From Swiss-Prot:
This is Bifunctional glutamine synthetase adenylyltransferase/adenylyl-removing enzyme. It comes from Xanthomonas campestris pv. campestris (strain B100). Its EC number is 2.7.7.89, 2.7.7.42. The gene is glnE. Pfam families: GlnD_UR_UTase, GlnE. The keyword Disulfide bond does not apply. The keyword Nucleotidyltransferase applies. InterPro entries: GlnE, GlnE_rpt_dom, NT_sf, PII_UdlTrfase/GS_AdlTrfase. Residues 1-436 are annotated as: Adenylyl removase.
């Protein structure tokens, strides 16, 4: 026979030859020796004494493995009449199936991912097979557990750790937790309470799998991850589990339950209960407190490694498997409450999700994935050698040679050289994530000042850039002795003492240091009860610096951050400085919330997304990464998406209660800034509601029908209620419906026919002006198109130019007298002379006067598009286009700047603003639309 492993030492070659001979000898005398088996068997014998032992005990298995692509083995059927055979059947099956896993792995038929999945599937199969047999046995002895509501209760077996993640290594124990949905009692001749019933069942299951017999074991079972550990009950009801995690749940248990999965018993009930546990595992907001618990866990493992000299442990040692797991899981826990894609049990998909979200850069993600697969492959080979639960690199030369050659390396040193870069990279990435916060060693006057408060005086604050050091001192002293600070735990107080000096240094570097400090303290006061935000600022210095910068430049964002600390998450989102979402992405972000079954929860999530998205738009505006005119358009797109989402929510609610109006249609028309796609931060929405339905349909078709008109009125009311409902994230929008037909005196909803009649017969010129900027933003497509037709019919009416201009001027004069807040030194950007409303009136007059001849004008609603359209039809001279665009952009930018800093839109008339207003006024004059002078003129 030729040498099967050419590079094997003589001793190893002899060992392999003896192993092959042992397998051959175990075959019955009349059994044929499969052709071509010598070399594959030698390779497997090199890698695994366990497989050789198994083949010696089960020689018939060899013919199965000798197939070109050995399929799965048949699952044993445990005969209820022969429970004494169950253990042997399970152990023989597990040994044979494990031998198949080794065979496929060593011969390259499976990659490491498939091997891990196969080991997981084998454990699940044994669990399910054993539990099914035991359940039948218990039902015969004790009956089934029946809850108070009459439902049959079954045991739920949760797999944690690598079993839950579908990544079980070859010779791993299985971490199990037992639970059951409801309390009750069994209904058999020897009844048991549910707790006792399921505890006994769980203990029998563990024994059937774990106990070592003449046939070995099936799977080592570890029940220590259950609530209260070894001291806890073997099985708990879901209610008991809930109470435990609400009162006793610890940080390390979040890591343990991150991968949890029901693997046997009542799978559906287990999955449903895990959904209720999700808020414990994944906190709603960014949660950097998870890193403290992780540091403690890692420190304990590091101490154990050092104590037992386990530096060669590829699981727990430096740069080992555990560090990759901890790194990925910690980022999952920090962000998984906000990012559903991170709620992933499997490590490699979770790692890819982190890359996709920009939390790990692609090269690092690839390096970690390669390291993980390499380490798991080595780990499996260490365990496959003798079916031992080991993670330590071997010390003996024979074992080293076998592992190295089996993995395709010429010698042990070559394997170590391949392993070292992986461990080095993993250790470096892990250290960067979990490096303990460094305490300042150099003297820091501000740190000393803060720790001394409320004692001391303002002296340390003098000469460092504050305009009013004494006031700053009083603010800081009041904060230091506030009830919120006094109530902090020792750990949170330590964090605050680290954060405060950094915040003070950042504040005095700000353009407005006093305002920055005042706003920082307001934010801290609002967030002290959530220590996760202190942890965020402590763990992420870049977020701290960014926060103070934003607070110093925007009173509005300071208010929003203090009111809704969830926005702090946005400062760490890598997307915050990238391209802003387009119209389709904004729509998707909003309508995705409809997947949440609970209306209140969906509304809260929608609110949070609106807050986050408008915050991103505000930051882009503040940083100059986006033109203000573009920001107002994006804010309108966002509002449009929110209205569309809320309409669907409202329709679902109303239809559940009252059915729907057959053939009926409903549409929401956006007027004003929403219609003109020029929405500001905090703007309300001008809405008009339309409906239509077949004449013969009088009512909705539900169990509690409503008259058709009333149904649509109720729908409009629901939309308004949902848009204005208070949630933990505030409310969506304030709504103004006064632009509907007949204003405040009119019906909340208008039929299409009455709306058409009103626009034709009774609407004032100013209402037709408002219609210029109106557009359908949500609802039935056919009705929206019908609105477009009504708008077209109305706006293309032939008008007397002189009367039109007179009406426009009169309305503008009335608004000026009532709304213009300009004075001798300041201009009202919106209502002042040459301001935004003058520009709107100019363009609206142009459309009303020209649309009969040029209906293409009606395609435009937004100011920039209206300017271009009126130039195109030569109502505005071509040379006025650029100045008007510039004037509009200047006024919008000034207005947004005021809003972002919480100032009224009354500004000193600087040269750029004065020029913009003069351009608008001059062009209006040229069109015979000389508007009344402003109050400050």
């Amino acid at each position: 026979m030729s040498q099967p492993i050419p590079s094997a030492s003589p001793a190893l070659a002899a060992l392999i030859e003896r192993a092959v001979a042992r397998v051959r000898h175990a075959l019955p005398a009349d059994a044929p020796w499969p052709e071509g088996l010598e070399h594959p068997l030698a390779r497997v014998a090199l890698a695994s004494d366990f497989v050789v032992d198994t083949l010696a005990r089960q020689p018939a298995l060899l013919a199965h493995l000798a197939q070109p692509d050995p399929p799965p083995l048949p699952v044993p059927r445990l005969d209820p009449a022969q429970p004494q055979e169950w253990a042997a059947q399970l152990r023989r099956y597990r040994a044979a199936a494990s031998a198949r896993l080794v065979w496929r792995d060593v011969l390259g038929l499976d990659d490491v991912d498939a091997t891990l999945a196969g080991a997981t599937m084998l454990a699940e199969t044994c669990l399910q097979c054993a539990l099914q047999a035991l359940e039948q046995q218990f039902a015969t002895r004790h009956g089934q557990v029946i809850a108070e509501d009459g439902s049959v209760q079954r045991l739920v077996v949760f797999g944690l750790g690598k079993l839950g993640g579908g990544e079980l290594n070859f010779s791993s124990d299985v971490d199990l937790v037992y639970a059951y949905p409801q309390a009750g009692q069994s209904d058999g001749a020897r009844p048991l309470a549910a707790e006792e019933y399921f505890a006994r069942l769980g203990q029998q299951l563990a024994k059937l799998l774990d106990e070592t017999t003449a046939d070995g074991f099936s799977h080592r079972v570890d029940l220590r991850l259950r609530p209260f550990g070894s001291a806890g009950r073997v099985a708990l009801s879901f209610n008991g589990m809930d109470q435990y995690f609400q009162r006793e749940g610890r940080d390390w248990e979040r890591y343990a339950w991150l991968k949890a999965r029901p693997v046997a018993g009542d799978i559906a009930a287990g999955e449903a209960w895990l959904e209720t546990l999700r808020p414990f595992v994944y906190r709603r907001y960014l949660d950097f407190t998870a890193l403290d618990g992780l540091r403690d866990m890692k420190a304990a493992i590091t101490a154990e490694v050092a104590r037992h000299a386990r530096l060669d442990d590829i699981k727990r040692g430096p740069g080992g498997i555990r560090e990759i797991e901890f790194l990925v899981q910690s980022l999952q826990l920090i962000r998984g409450g906000r990012e559903a894609s991170l709620r992933e049990r499997r490590l490699l998909p979770a790692l890819q999700a982190l890359v996709d979200l920009g939390q790990i850069d692609p090269p690092t993600g690839q390096a970690l994935a390669e390291a993980y697969r390499f380490l798991r492959r080595v780990e499996n080979r260490l365990q496959m050698l003798r079916d031992a639960q080991t993670h330590a690199l071997p010390q003996g030369e024979p074992e080293r040679e076998r592992i190295a050659l089996g993995l395709g390396y010429a010698h042990w040193q070559a394997l170590l050289e391949a392993l070292a870069p992986h461990r080095t990279r993993v250790a470096a990435e892990f250290a960067e994530l979990l490096a303990p916060r460094v305490h300042a060693t150099a003297p820091d006057t501000l740190a000393d000042y803060w720790r001394a408060l409320p004692e001391g005086d303002a002296a340390p604050l003098l000469g460092i850039g504050l305009h009013d050091p004494n006031n700053a001192h009083h603010m800081l002293a009041d904060f230091a002795q506030s009830s919120g600070v006094r109530a902090l735990s020792d750990g949170a107080r330590t964090r605050l003492d680290r954060v405060m000096p950094a915040l003070l240094h950042a504040a005095i570097r700000a353009t407005q240091p006093d305002a920055a400090l005042r706003r920082v303290l307001g934010l801290l006061q609002a967030t002290l009860r959530r220590t996760s935000y202190l942890a965020l600022l402590d763990e992420q210095p870049s977020a701290l610096a960014r926060l103070v910068d934003v607070l110093s430049r925007s009173a509005l964002l300071a208010e929003r951050l203090a009111a809704y600390p969830l926005l702090l998450d946005e400062l760490l989102d890598t997307r915050i400085s990238g391209p802003l979402p387009d119209r389709a992405a904004l729509h998707t972000a909003c309508v995705d919330t409809l997947q949440i079954d609970d209306t209140e929860a969906a509304l809260r999530e929608l609110n949070e997304r609106r807050l986050a998205l408008s915050f991103r738009i505000a930051l882009a505006t503040l940083d100059g990464r986006q033109q203000p005119v573009d920001s107002t358009q994006q804010l309108a797109w966002l509002a449009e998406a929110v209205v569309q989402t809320v309409l669907q929510l409202a329709q679902t609610q109303l239809q559940a209660a009252h059915g729907q109006v057959p053939g009926g249609a409903f549409a929401i028309i956006g007027y004003g800034s929403l219609g003109g796609m020029e929405l500001g931060f905090g703007s309300d929405l001008d809405l008009v509601f339309l409906y239509d339905h077949p004449r013969e349909v009088e009512a909705s078709d539900g169990k509690r029908p409503l008259e058709a008109g009333r149904w649509f009125a109720r729908l409009a009311q629901k939309v308004m209620t949902l848009l204005g409902a208070e949630t933990g994230a505030g409310r969506l929008y304030d709504i103004d419906v006064r632009l509907r037909p007949d204003g405040g005196k009119g019906a909340l909803v208008s039929s299409l026919a009455s709306y058409r009649d009103y626009q034709r017969d009774r609407a004032w010129t100013w209402e037709h002006q408002a219609l210029v900027r109106a557009r359908a933003v949500a609802g039935d497509a056919a009705l929206c198109e019908a609105f477009v037709q009504v708008r077209r019919e109305t706006l293309t009416r032939v008008r007397d130019p002189a009367l039109l201009h007179e009406d426009v001027r009169k309305m503008r004069a009335r608004m000026r007298s009532e709304l213009d807040r300009s004075d001798a030194g300041r201009l009202d950007l919106k209502q002042g002379a040459g301001g935004l409303v003058d520009l709107e009136f100019l363009l609206q007059a142009g459309v009303l006067g020209q649309a009969a001849q040029h209906p293409a004008l009606l395609l435009a609603c937004a100011t920039p598009a209206l300017i271009d359209a009126l130039v195109q039809v030569q109502w505005l001279p071509a040379e006025s286009a650029a100045p008007l665009h510039h004037a509009h952009a200047t006024l919008v930018e000034a207005g947004l700047s005021c809003t972002l800093d919480r100032r009224p839109r009354l500004v000193v008339s600087t040269p750029p603003i004065r020029d913009a207003c003069q351009i608008v006024a001059a062009i209006a004059d040229a069109q015979q639309l000389r508007f009344q002078p402003g109050k400050g003129a």
